[in-house]
């Protein structure tokens, strides 16, 4: 292991220099760390002390800092330095010093057995990491030796102190193994050695746990030690006696938590499923906890009920398949399942009265998966047993999903409400999963219950019960195709009978209707049963999200059946928009809903509705355009522009978004004449320009204007063609006055859709040349303040090369300047900008042969590009961007091979470039590897990743384990 270089520095004023890591200087730095009020001095001291801990001198001062006359803070620092040395710098220790180091650690642990516990733990960690480094060859019976040494009668420390110290050492040993940095082959050897050594540990633990005279602190430590060892995947049958003792210890409240942890860890080991006989012996032990569980629930003892539930779930969830296979024991496993059911349905509202039920949900997934994985005959038998259980589970889950009373819910904190919301989502996911087991019968079951509830005249029903049943329907309908269910028509008929007196119920009614929108599209005759409810809810601000999102779903899925209701929907929507009932985001959704709705109407109807819908906003915008800019009218302008752009996002009379849905879709004939959106845009174009003239320097307003056209272009595609010339002209004026990234993004859309069409090429070429010229000027003035503009510009250039390389043929385009600016952009600190620049070069380099100006500039300035790429790989850019730079190298190699082979050797020639950590041989190997690989891009990426690690001095370190 390489030694770290020590940095010169001091632990504050008057402290020793960095290389003078003496006891005195360390003590002085520690005093500064703990007691100096100056935070800067504290930070300096901490940095210096961290260097001290890894220095060679740490071997000397650590022992001196452990002297009895030192205060605990100093002793703790000395003890903390030792595990760092024994784990990370083991190679520094000469082999002839192993034994003396071991003896010193044993001595110190014995001395601190009755001293500071935190110091004792650090010393135990040091000895544990030393043992792991020596096992199995240099210290074959490490654990047995530890036990023997601490049981020696001639120790000055009392028996209980020695016992606790030994247990601490035995506890940290497996924990250190789990987090150790041992090489993989050594880890396997040490794991095997530890598994053998558990024979020296478990008898001792059993004896201490079952010994009546053992004090509570010792027994608790025993349980923690056992919990640590079982995670080494010790065979379950070897733990049987200790597990039984841990079950007995559950009756002791002081030992309860430690016992639960030990039992759960033992049961949860993956290999435990092989020990079926031991698992079968555990079922009665778990079932024996039911009375303790009931008492805990009755007394409101959440910790005890939580712990027992963890044990039951650990056994059921980890081993359901193995236990289901034991057919002759089906009744005992069913009893365990019913115990877990009790935990799922534990009384009280989650998370205020209980936090246990959520632990059980994954078990029901696992059990169902295991049952459904059996062959047909066996599955049928288990279905017969467990279908009733799963129907009971549905009842339990819907009961748990019920809201508390309004009064009680009002006292809940926002955090508790959020936890309950997440819990209900988990229940929803479980119900959706359970549908696979129960099928259509589940929907019938829910429908029957809801029907009885809503039609019963005997007793008044609670809204919570109704809401939960509807929530069950919604959970299933959102993800499962219910189009063929025979109960949905009845449900649609029941929904209007629900008396909605509460926002939670209103939300669930709305979301349920939304979940059934696809069904409504196939059964349009039922739309009128629920649409009035949705429109009525729009007028209420409380169920805003649910009502607006449901209307949007209906308008999207059922638009071809909505023309008879269109006037009413538009009128209600217009009313709520004018009254400003909803927040901004819901207003935007509502406009999207109206866009879907209008798409299915005749052009004349669309224009008529558009006129009535947006005229008030146009009038408002005209008024705002006359006013002097201020923050208040800016918000209003952005809001109106947002409404228009969201409307145009979905208003598509060509039905582009339906193209993937097959020929059977009922489409209207494609209308002749101008698109209604284009008609409206042309009408308001002058007004938008007027607004822009006053707000050109405001990025938010410019972005909102560009969004209208960008969303319209994306939706209308070729239908947008009549607007192209005037939009190009407007964008040019906008960008010339004040460059904004949003204008470049819109230009990119125009290039993508229209640049290949001869009729539109001239205005687009003129715009492209203009924005390029303006942006190049920006680069001359200093582009670092505008990473967003540079990012968008690079994306525009890449799109132009991809879609219409002819744009680079124009003599007025300064390709050389563009190239140099892109090289500069590679050095930006912002990752998105660098990615966009790399994307530009990967599009540019393949054009070397076909576009003369590109070929010329690559020949002249390509070496500059290569140097920038190598600098980035050498450490100037984030490691996350290496794939992007690898793409450039691959493109250079593929399209400019002869040039690259010359440049790369020249570029890597200077010593220290691109990193001082590289040898000439490593640089030569890299250049040869790159030049050889012209086909496999993935291999080039691997080479670059390997090379950048060498450049950064990270090759072979822990930092790169997941890289």
UniProtKB/Swiss-Prot annotation:
Keywords from the UniProt entry: Cytoplasm, Nucleus, Protein transport, Repeat, Transport
Superkingdom of the organism of origin: Eukaryota
Any one Gene Ontology molecular-function term assigned to this protein's record: small GTPase binding
HEAT repeats by residue range: 24-54, 56-88, 95-135, 142-179, 194-231, 236-268, 276-325, 330-372, 375-438, 440-476, 487-522, 524-558, 562-600, 603-648, 676-716, 720-754, 761-803, 815-845, 860-893, 897-931
Localisation per UniProt entry: Cytoplasm; Nucleus
Main localization, broad class: cytoplasm
GO cellular component, one term: nucleus
An individual GO BP term: protein import into nucleus
All residue ranges annotated as the Importin N-terminal domain in the record: 45-111
Transmembrane annotation, as ranges: none
SMART domains xrefs: IBN_N
Stated family: Belongs to the importin beta family.
Described function: Functions in nuclear protein import as nuclear transport receptor. Serves as receptor for nuclear localization signals (NLS) in cargo substrates. Is thought to mediate docking of the importin/substrate complex to the nuclear pore complex (NPC) through binding to nucleoporin and the complex is subsequently translocated through the pore by an energy requiring, Ran-dependent mechanism. At the nucleoplasmic side of the NPC, Ran binds to the importin, the importin/substrate complex dissociates and importin is re-exported from the nucleus to the cytoplasm where GTP hydrolysis releases Ran.
Quaternary data: Interacts with UBC9, RAN, RBM8A, eIF-1A and PAX6.
Name this protein carries in UniProt: Importin-13
Species: Pongo abelii (Sumatran orangutan)
Lineage: Eukaryota, Metazoa, Chordata, Craniata, Vertebrata
Underlying gene: IPO13
């Amino acid at each position: 292991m390489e030694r770290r270089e020590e940095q010169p520095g001091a632990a504050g004023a008057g402290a020793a220099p960095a290389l003078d890591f003496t006891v005195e200087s360390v003590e002085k730095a520690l005093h500064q760390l703990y007691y100096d009020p100056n935070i800067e001095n504290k930070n300096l001291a901490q940095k210096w002390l961290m260097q001290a801990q890894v220095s060679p001198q740490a071997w000397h001062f650590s022992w001196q800092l452990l002297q009895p006359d030192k205060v605990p803070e100093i002793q703790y620092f000395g003890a903390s330095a030792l595990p760092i040395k024994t784990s990370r710098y083991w190679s520094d220790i000469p082999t002839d010093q192993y034994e003396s180091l071991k003896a010193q650690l044993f001595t110190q642990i014995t001395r601190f057995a009755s001293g500071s516990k935190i110091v004792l733990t650090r010393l135990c960690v040091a000895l544990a990491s030393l043992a792991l480094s020596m096992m199995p060859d240099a210290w074959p019976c490490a654990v047995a030796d530890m036990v023997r040494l601490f049981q020696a009668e001639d120790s000055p420390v009392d028996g209980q102190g020695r016992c606790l110290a030994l247990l601490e050492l035995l506890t940290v040993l497996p924990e250190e193994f789990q987090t150790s940095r041992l090489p993989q082959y050594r880890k396997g050897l040490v794991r095997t050695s530890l598994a053998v050594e558990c024979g020296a540990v478990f008898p001792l633990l059993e004896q201490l746990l079952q010994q009546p005279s053992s004090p509570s602190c010792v027994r608790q430590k025993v349980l923690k030690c056992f919990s640590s060892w079982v995670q080494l995947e010790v065979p379950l049958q070897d733990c049987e006696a200790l597990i039984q003792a841990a079950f007995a210890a559950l009756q002791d409240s002081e030992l309860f938590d430690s016992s639960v942890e030990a039992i759960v860890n033992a049961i949860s080991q993956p290999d435990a499923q092989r020990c079926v006989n031991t698992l079968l012996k555990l079922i009665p032990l778990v079932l024996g906890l039911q009375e303790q569980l009931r008492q805990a629930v009755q007394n409101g003892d959440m910790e005890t009920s939580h712990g027992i539930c963890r044990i039951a779930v650990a056994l059921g969830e980890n081993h359901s398949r193995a236990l289901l296979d034991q057919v002759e024991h089906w009744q005992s496993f069913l009893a365990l399942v019913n115990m877990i059911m009790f935990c799922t349905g534990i009384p009280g509202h989650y998370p205020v009265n209980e936090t246990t039920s959520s632990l059980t949900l994954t078990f029901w997934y696992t059990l169902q998966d295991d049952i459904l994985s059996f062959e047909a005959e066996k599955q049928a038998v288990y279905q017969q047993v467990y279908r009733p259980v799963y129907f009971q589970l549905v009842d339990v889950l819907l009961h748990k999903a019920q809201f508390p009373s309004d009064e009680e819910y009002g006292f809940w904190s926002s955090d508790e409400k959020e936890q309950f919301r997440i819990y209900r989502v988990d229940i929803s996911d479980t119900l959706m999963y359970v549908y696979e087991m129960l099928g259509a019968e589940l929907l019938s079951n829910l429908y029957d219950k809801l029907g009885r509830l809503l039609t019963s005249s005997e007793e008044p029903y609670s809204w919570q019960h109704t809401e939960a049943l509807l929530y069950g329907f919604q959970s299933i309908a959102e993800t499962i195709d219910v189009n063929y269910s025979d109960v949905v028509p009845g449900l649609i008929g029941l929904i209007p009978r629900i008396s909605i007196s509460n926002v939670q119920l209103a939300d669930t009614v709305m979301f349920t209707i939304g979940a059934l929108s696809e069904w409504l599209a196939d059964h349009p005759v039922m739309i009128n049963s629920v649409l009035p409810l949705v429109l009525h809810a729009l007028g209420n601000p409380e169920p805003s999200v649910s009502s607006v999102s449901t209307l949007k779903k209906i308008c999207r899925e059922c638009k071809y059946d909505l023309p008879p209701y269109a006037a009413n929907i538009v009128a209600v929507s217009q009313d709520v928009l004018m009254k400003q009932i909803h927040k901004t985001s819901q207003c935007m959704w509502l406009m999207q809903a109206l866009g879907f709705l209008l798409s299915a109407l005749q052009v004349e109807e669309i224009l008529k509705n558009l006129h009535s819908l947006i005229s008030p906003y146009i009038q408002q915008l005209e008024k705002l355009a006359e006013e002097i800019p201020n923050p208040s009218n800016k918000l209003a302008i952005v809001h109106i522009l947002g409404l228009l752009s969201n409307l145009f996002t979905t208003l598509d009379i060509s039905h582009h978004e339906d193209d993937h849905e097959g020929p059977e879709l009922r489409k209207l004939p494609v209308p002749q004449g101008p698109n209604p959106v284009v008609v409206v845009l042309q009408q308001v174009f002058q007004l938008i320009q007027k607004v822009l003239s006053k707000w050109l320097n405001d990025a938010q307003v410019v972005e909102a204007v560009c969004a209208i056209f960008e969303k319209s272009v994306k939706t209308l595609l070729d239908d947008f063609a009549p607007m192209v010339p005037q939009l190009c002209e407007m964008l040019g004026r906008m960008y010339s006055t004040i460059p904004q990234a949003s204008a470049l993004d819109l230009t990119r859309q125009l290039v993508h859709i229209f640049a290949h069409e001869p009729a539109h090429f001239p205005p687009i070429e003129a715009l492209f040349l203009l924005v390029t010229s303006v942006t190049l000027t920006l680069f001359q003035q200093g582009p670092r303040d505008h990473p967003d503009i540079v990012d968008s510009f690079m994306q525009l250039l890449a799109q132009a090369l991809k879609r219409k390389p002819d744009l680079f043929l124009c003599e007025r385009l300064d390709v050389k300047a563009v190239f140099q600016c892109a090289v500069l952009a590679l050095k930006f600190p912002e990752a998105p900008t660098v990615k966009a620049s790399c994307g530009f070069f990967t599009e540019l380099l393949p054009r070397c042969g076909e576009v003369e100006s590109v070929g010329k500039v690559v020949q002249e300035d390509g070496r500059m590009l290569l140097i920038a790429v190598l600098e980035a790989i050498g450490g100037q850019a984030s490691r996350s961007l290496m794939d992007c730079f690898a793409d450039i190298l691959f493109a250079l190699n593929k399209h400019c091979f002869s040039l690259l082979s010359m440049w790369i050797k020249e570029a890597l020639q200077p010593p220290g470039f691109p990193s001082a950590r590289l040898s000439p041989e490593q640089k030569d190997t890299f250049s040869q590897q790159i030049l050889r690989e012209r086909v496999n891009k993935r291999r080039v990426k691997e080479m670059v990743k390997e090379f950048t690690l060498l450049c950064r001095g990270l090759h072979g370190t822990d930092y790169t384990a997941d890289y």
